[in-house]
Structures are given as structure tokens and as C-alpha cells.
Amino acid sequence: MVQQSVEESAVSEPCLNRVGIRNCRDSLFERLVRTEREARREDFIGVLRRQGRMHPAIAAYAGAMFYADERLEPVPCPHQTEVLPGYPVPPADRLDEVLSRERVIFIPSERGGGGGRSDKVNACEARIVADLVARIRRMAGNGFSCEKTIGVIVPYRNQITMIRREMERRCPGDAPDICIDTVERFQGSQRDVIICSLTVNSDAQLGFLTANSFEENGRVIDRKLNVTLTRARRQMILTGNPEILSGSDVYAGLMERIRRDGKYMKWTL
């Protein structure tokens, strides 16, 4: 993924264009596939259909949205056969109960909430994320690991600061060691639980969030969302403003699917 627009990352040098390098946002494998297809060769692709990271209930979302042709299947690894997320400490309230049984959860947030300091923060989502981290930390008991249990994905570094501030209030001992980072820096990583604060306060920010999208075989592929949804092994939790997110067909479809197959839950702090 890249931060530049298609125009900014375009390559105009003829010598590079001749060898298939047309845009710096295109990966090596995208260039190889395009080169082979333009040469009308079809026996160059091998598709991996088994994955050992995501529980099937989580993989179903990325599979339906981005990998329908590949039909991803679990290896299966032990955690992929578990019926429930499985926290050893009993739930204390309704949200704990949801965390104990649901694999994919969406919690709607309020618009803005940065106190006028920046449009790249959302205080409501920061409180939600910190509360979720504290709950999972408590319910995981002795099995909790800052390096393995939880990761938090956000689009803006300003939001990282706000979330850490809220975490220091709710789970001060673990706050510095839990990874909170942008989706670009989360590529290649995984955690048992991924919490994503989408932090969109305007239509313009929704455009930024979905900027790394392209169309393939009539389907819109959102690179950032794809990476986000495929980082979690056991549980995926998202929070964002549904009114703004509905402006994207991809996010509107995701929220509708969560309403149907996961858990769309309002929670006020």
C-alpha cells in the first residue's frame, strides 16, 4: 500500500514502462501477472486456497469481499476449529458476553469527538478501544500477552496518541506495550484479537480511508480493509461512524454483513 495518489506514483520513463513498471503503487506480483496476461499466457498462476491465520468466521468476510474466486479454506490449525473465542474469565456484563461468543463485532461511534484539537482523532472511538483492551486483558487472565493477544489498527498517528492516553487510564500497566499502529505498518503481522478504530469524521476522510482501492473482475478491492480484516486470528472488532462509512459501498456492505452474520452492537461509555 502507498500513501500517494495514482497520479503522484505514476512512472513516465519509457525504459521502465517497457519492462512493465507503470506505477510505483503496483507490486512486483501485480506486474508479473499483468505481463503474463498481456502476453496471453494462462499457465503462470498458482492459487493458495488454505490459510492458517484466521478463524473461518473471520476469514468469511475477507473471502466474500476480496477472495471469492480463491475460496479460502482453513488449514485447519487448532485455533481455527474452536467454537467460541474462549476467554477463561467469565463475562461481567453484556459486552463481555458478546466478546465471549462473537468472532466479528462492529461498535458504532459518534461523529468527531476530538474536542476541536484535530479532525484526525475520534475521542469516542478512543474510549471504546481502551475499554475493549481493558476487558480483553481482564478476561484473558494469565494467558494475556501484549505481543500476541491484541493489536490496534488506526488510520492516523494522532489517534494512536489519543488511544494510548485512554488506555493509560483503564489499563496503565500494559498501555505502553500493546501495538497500536497504522494498517500500512501492520502488514505481515497478526494478533489473536484485532481492534480497528476507523476514525472517519468526514466524507473527505472516508476518501482517504478507501484511497487504496482498485477494481478486479468487477469487484472493488480495498487494500487497506483487506489487510485489516486479515490480521486477526481469533476475533475482529471494528468501531467507526456508520453514517459516514455508508458512503462507501465496500464499508456499507461490510456493516450489512456484520449485522447479518456477526454482531453490530451499540455501546455507550
Task: Tell what function each PLM region has.
Residues 1-269:
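Conserved helicase motor core of SF1/SF2 NTP-dependent helicases
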